[in-house]
Amino acid sequence: MAERGGDGGESERFNPGELRMAQQQALRFRGPAPPPNAVMRGPPPLMRPPPPFGMMRGPPPPPRPPFGRPPFDPNMPPMPPPGGIPPPMGPPHLQRPPFMPPPMSSMPPPPGMMFPPGMPPVTAPGTPALPPTEEIWVENKTPDGKVYYYNARTRESAWTKPDGVKVIQQSELTPMLAAQAQVQAQAQAQAQAQAQAQAQAQAQAQAQAQAQAQAQAQAQAQAQAQAQAQAQAQAQAQAQAQVQAQVQAQVQAQAVGASTPTTSSPAPAVSTSTSSSTPSSTTSTTTTATSVAQTVSTPTTQDQTPSSAVSVATPTVSVSTPAPTATPVQTVPQPHPQTLPPAVPHSVPQPTTAIPAFPPVMVPPFRVPLPGMPIPLPGVAMMQIVSCPYVKTVATTKTGVLPGMAPPIVPMIHPQVAIAASPATLAGATAVSEWTEYKTADGKTYYYNNRTLESTWEKPQELKEKEKLEEKIKEPIKEPSEEPLPMETEEEDPKEEPIKEIKEEPKEEEMTEEEKAAQKAKPVATAPIPGTPWCVVWTGDERVFFYNPTTRLSMWDRPDDLIGRADVDKIIQEPPHKKGMEELKKLRHPTPTMLSIQKWQFSMSAIKEEQELMEEINEDEPVKAKKRKRDDNKDIDSEKEAAMEAEIKAARERAIVPLEARMKQFKDMLLERGVSAFSTWEKELHKIVFDPRYLLLNPKERKQVFDQYVKTRAEEERREKKNKIMQAKEDFKKMMEEAKFNPRATFSEFAAKHAKDSRFKAIEKMKDREALFNEFVAAARKKEKEDSKTRGEKIKSDFFELLSNHHLDSQSRWSKVKDKVESDPRYKAVDSSSMREDLFKQYIEKIAKNLDSEKEKELERQARIEASLREREREVQKARSEQTKEIDREREQHKREEAIQNFKALLSDMVRSSDVSWSDTRRTLRKDHRWESGSLLEREEKEKLFNEHIEALTKKKREHFRQLLDETSAITLTSTWKEVKKIIKEDPRCIKFSSSDRKKQREFEEYIRDKYITAKADFRTLLKETKFITYRSKKLIQESDQHLKDVEKILQNDKRYLVLDCVPEERRKLIVAYVDDLDRRGPPPPPTASEPTRRSTK
């Protein structure tokens, strides 16, 4: 840190609190140095590198049911950074608006978001607390009326009423807390008196600590002087004389110019040193022969966890550590607050009054971590508090930061940072650099600012100037040493580049006005209000608002529950962050004796550093460059290994969790982080890269899910924006309706009156507001005009109704009617008498018109009636004529059918032979009287009926003749007509068939032919029915005729075989042909086989 002028700068480096702490440790621990501890405190917050990619503290845990905590996976490794992308512009916990958690539908905070084990919420200084031995639960309600219960001390909440505890109402807490406020005020007064007594005791112990420090420093200087080589003694003596002269001049200049602040004064002479050793050896801090220091060792017991190494110039606390991988960083010890209990194993010390309790999702002052985040307390091994009933100790990285933790901007307790300057910084007296150079996985170089937390690809101007200064310093000492380097016990400084002092003013100039305003508007401190779910929050611009973690509600005005409470006023008047700063300022004012001691210590430490500078100049520069390069490569390799380890771990988890669930969680992360749908992947990456859900998908799947999210979210954002605009317009219209202003008012008058209304401000553009106003005014004027018109019509209709009640006619006079109706309110509703008379005349005219129109309507009605009657008559006549025609048609049809029946009866009686003709028969039929009954029939119809009668007679005779032939058993298939004629000629059926013998013969031959065809078909059927004949029959017949005889013997039992006895040759041909056909077909298919015609063609 830069000196702020004279003694004030020295007092910052060494204050009474530090000496007091060193003295207490010296009195407490009288044994050797404690055993080494690999877990050590990291460098100061401003000297830490940027957080690795993919590692962040994470968002607040999601809502969980009461009394539940999520499982913790101790095997979860730190998430590695993605390759090729610099760190984001700010820590993850500052990338969202403060105190703006997502809506939880008015639910109380789940217990999982309460403070972790070992860190109970405590009250702010001066606020009343509840009885520590009594567990009290408070019944409260959410805005929507749901009842829930919360612990008045731990803020733990539940939906169900707890058993076995005291439950009170919210209103009962106020008198209880008011009574306890007085008791606590007395306790505070006693605590202040004790603190003053302790301060006096510590001041007395400072002199003893200084004397011990001088004795130890002299002993170490003598031991080191004897170990130095004789060849280097003269060179070091000469260099020491030169350095002492320079240091004395600097000390005198500082003493003379104490009142003139400088920005380029040397850094405080507080250095860090490390030594290399095997895993079994230890690392200890050493000083040169001219340095004066006092070593105070802190032993540890078997039950205690070794604390981190802390070393200062005066007094120096030296701790031996094995730490093969961790580099011990020496810092000035901080005095523990009065209320800070000592550290015990497996616990994190928490102040009871110095650090207030905080609601979930709020950034506490001094970066008090939330559950799952490390607590960087000075002098205490870093531990990670997880959401389960145990504390896990986590090893720190080389930078002293826990894996996955972003560097905090403000330390919890302001430490006096001891910065070891390199030779270049001592020679140039430059400030600590804000920028640090890093490399991505693919080798690209980027630069990170430790203060503003921003990163850039281009090299900052500050680093360019620093490199130029280093080159100028190295120019006169570029002669390489050819002599072999002697073996040394101390390890060279592993720093990559000289560290400059911190410059405050240039950093402030780099920030823009908007960034400064945003920085000031962020919350810096908070204090809970006992007995209520509300907390008081202070911002950087000295503003105060109230936050309810139960309902996730923030408001500038004081809630109704807190109005009239004196303890709330006291909390607001005494901000905890300001009180802590005042106490820190008091500790920084030293006594005159201390200033003289500090000046002497500063001169001795400066001589030591100058001697180390001369030794380092004589060393081989190429060797240092190689070592620095190896260290850089080791850092890069370690980062790559961490990234690969995290990727492997994430790949294992991806193999367990289904892709759909991982994609859903990734989309939820994009939505929670406020990723814009109208931006690119590269611009939005810094919002999500530190979220643990970022590694749920591989790079390709992340890009695909992001593209899908952008497509869907873009439409949703447009819809939300449109709905928001519509809602704002509706609210603006509602505001104008509630205003009830005159429609003739101007927009300027309206805007001046309602400019402070939130609904007025919701419409961003003044042009849109004026357009909505003009539209509303136009609608109001139109409505007013319509109302006026409607009101006039109503008055007119009421006046006409009044006149109609008096049964006026066209002969009525206004002078007579006026006297009858002037007392009626409907008469008075008309404004003027002239308008009343005009309305009367209109009514009389209307009556006259109504009379004329009624007469016309009556005439028209009569004409319509007559026309309808005539039309009906025509329709009736038409229907009647159609019915008559139908009846006549049916009558004629009936007569025709009757005539046909009579004619057929006549033909049946008169025509008995089928050999007669129509011409001959017609003469005979004419003589019968029934001939006249068929007069309705035409000649062609009569002839047609005659031919049908003759065909029926012929068919009947033929059937009888064939029946005769069937009954004649002597007839065979080979019989002739001559043979048969002799047999049947005497039968009446043969005689009636026909008188022509040729006709009978032709009919007989046709009968024999039909019978022969039928006999052959029946015989084929018989062969198919005979199972004895198979496809093997032909082969058997060829071998022997006996098989054929057997077949014939079997067939002889059937009549169908015997019918063909007259043609045995033809019968045998049929048998042989059937056997050949079976042989050609071969074996029959199985019963389950389909027929060839039904087989599939596929």
UniProtKB/Swiss-Prot annotation:
SUPFAM superfamilies (alphabetical): FF domain (SSF81698), WW domain (SSF51045)
Bias (Basic and acidic residues) ranges: 1-15, 469-481, 496-506, 630-640
Chain span(s) of sequence motif Nuclear localization signal: 626-630
A biological process term (GO) from this entry: RNA splicing
Keywords, sorted A to Z: Activator, Coiled coil, Isopeptide bond, Methylation, Nucleus, Phosphoprotein, Repeat, Repressor, Transcription, Transcription regulation, Ubl conjugation
Omega-N-methylarginine: residues bearing it: 20
Pro residues bias spans: 32-105, 334-344
UniProt-listed InterPro entries: FF_domain, FF_domain_sf, TCRG1-like, WW_dom, WW_dom_sf
Gene3D superfamilies in UniProt: 2.20.70.10, FF domain
Glycyl lysine isopeptide (Lys-Gly) (interchain with G-Cter in SUMO2), cross-linked positions: 503, 507, 608
Induction and repression of expression: Up-regulated in brain tissue from patients with Huntington disease.
Subcellular location: Nucleus
WW domain span: 131-164, 429-462, 528-561
Protein name: Transcription elongation regulator 1
Gene it is expressed from: TCERG1
